[in-house]
Amino acid sequence: MRVGLGYDVHKLVENRKLILGGVEIPYEKGLLGHSDADVLLHAIMDSLLGACALGDIGRHFPDTDNKFKGISSIKLLEEVNKLIIKNRYIINNIDSVIIAQKPKLAPYIDTMTENISNALNIKIDQINIKATTEEGLGFTGGMLGISSQSICSVIKK
């Protein structure tokens, strides 16, 4: 069994959609980034790539490449899954946390989980997503941005 860790953070700005786990969440701000800036999926992808010793999302989907501009991170997650399969790994589980002062994310977590399950072709019970705040402290607590952390385990076939 192998373990991978992922982390991502993006700045909250006006005139952008807030996409987390492939879900568009109603909010007055969204995350700034080259793609859709989905910090949850970016952290998950980095944890999976790390567990398989395949680098990180910047290596596979560089922000200098215009073909990834505005792309859905669900599509990128599907591409990561192809790499995992090609390299003969099986996903055992994923555990992630989203750190955001606002908006409240609990109502969207089940849909996020379903989106990830579908993109990776794994069962719902192999995925856990939590949301928390920093109690008004720091970058996310000050509502300047949103971050996410993910850990996963994979097994070599």
Swiss-Prot record:
Cofactor binding, per record: Binds 1 divalent metal cation per subunit.
Keyword terms of this UniProt record: Isoprene biosynthesis, Lyase, Metal-binding
Residues annotated as binding 4-CDP-2-C-methyl-D-erythritol 2-phosphate: 8-10, 34-35, 56-58, 61-65, 132-135, 139
GO BP term (any one): terpenoid biosynthetic process
Reaction(s) this enzyme catalyzes, per UniProt: 4-CDP-2-C-methyl-D-erythritol 2-phosphate = 2-C-methyl-D-erythritol 2,4-cyclic diphosphate + CMP
InterPro entries xrefs: MECDP_synthase, MECDP_synthase_CS, MECDP_synthase_sf
Names of required cofactors: a divalent metal cation
Segment forming the signal sequence: none
Cystine pairs: none
NCBIfam families: ispF
Function: Involved in the biosynthesis of isopentenyl diphosphate (IPP) and dimethylallyl diphosphate (DMAPP), two major building blocks of isoprenoid compounds. Catalyzes the conversion of 4-diphosphocytidyl-2-C-methyl-D-erythritol 2-phosphate (CDP-ME2P) to 2-C-methyl-D-erythritol 2,4-cyclodiphosphate (ME-CPP) with a corresponding release of cytidine 5-monophosphate (CMP).
Protein name: 2-C-methyl-D-erythritol 2,4-cyclodiphosphate synthase
Organism: Clostridium botulinum (strain Eklund 17B / Type B)
